[in-house]
Amino acid sequence: NLQRLDGPVRGNGKIIQELEGDFRGAGWNVIKLVWGGYWDPLLAADKEGILRKVMEDSVDGEYQAYKAHDGKFVRDYFFGKHPKLLEMVARMSDEDIWRLNRGGHDPHKVYAAFDSASKHVGRPTVILAKTIKGYGMGQVGQAKNPTHQQKKLDIDSIREFRDRFAIPIPDDQLEKVPYFKPAEDSPEMKYLHERRKALGGYLPRRRQKADEHLTVPKLDVFKAVLDPTAEGREISTTQSFVRVLNQILRDKEIGPRVVPILVDESRTFGMEGLFRQIGIYTPDGQKYTPVDKDQVMYYREAADGQLLQEGINEAGGMSSWIAAATSYSTNNRIMVPFYIYYSMFGFQRIGDLCWAAGDMLARGFLLGGTAGR
């Protein structure tokens, strides 16, 4: 909608074209939903491309202003940029010009864009839809910078809003600003219920506990780790954990549910043995022969690998951890993720995601490995 909280996002540029470049560069299919259907006759009449050029040359700060004023303002400051454009709209009233809509507010164009996106195969699709912040709020808030601070509308603005969107609430109830809910047997409600059932149920829905139960290994499985060494030699906590993890991975029930996650630090923690034991997950398998293939603990990638190797990407590692740690709720399938990171690169890089994980009731293990001394 061109606006952030304080002002336009790219007042001197064009955010849609900027985002288009980002997505196309990443290999996405991009659908731009910029102009509504009322522009179609004008674009069809634009034989010399003048209208298209003015559209392209106008920056977002100008587009915000057009929808914060009225039809006369648009006539003077948009179509007024070229005499032939003024000729083009000479027979249109200011109201007609004001009715020229943005693509994101045209139901037909929105449908066409979504239909095209749903039929596209081979690449993900993004729809960049142009809309107006505060759409329908009229002079109180439409396309205005303080729109997000607007806490309430006066009665005239509420009436204007009701009329604008044809909400069936009588005048004598407007002061209470009641919610409108269609009747249960209305086409709208029937459609909403049908869609929710087709999609697997109602939202929001939170599964507190998975329906399945996993048997925890008995303590004597970890005897080799818990018993003191014959020489009374101390071992590092990192080494102890690696031994515990190895035992858990061997368990027939819990083992397949374990998700070890590392961010380019496996060798740092002495965990490279897992490369050979469980493999590094990659959807397409290993398409090359690793340089250390002749070694016992070589870098083995596999389509059925279990270890997630995220590279130097703590945010990615934590995101994978959250996905596995909330699987009991979202997928009704318990997973046991272990995210092991270099201690000094831990919460410093993923603090916000830890907070989010707590809000989501994520269940798993975060381990700060070597302290870096």
Residue ranges and their predicted role:
Residues 2-228:
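Long, well-ordered, tryptophan-enriched scaffold segments
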Residues 84-104, 108-112, 177-373:
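Thiamine diphosphate
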Residues 1, 31-33, 128-132, 136-140, ...:
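Generic beta-strand/beta-sheet core signal
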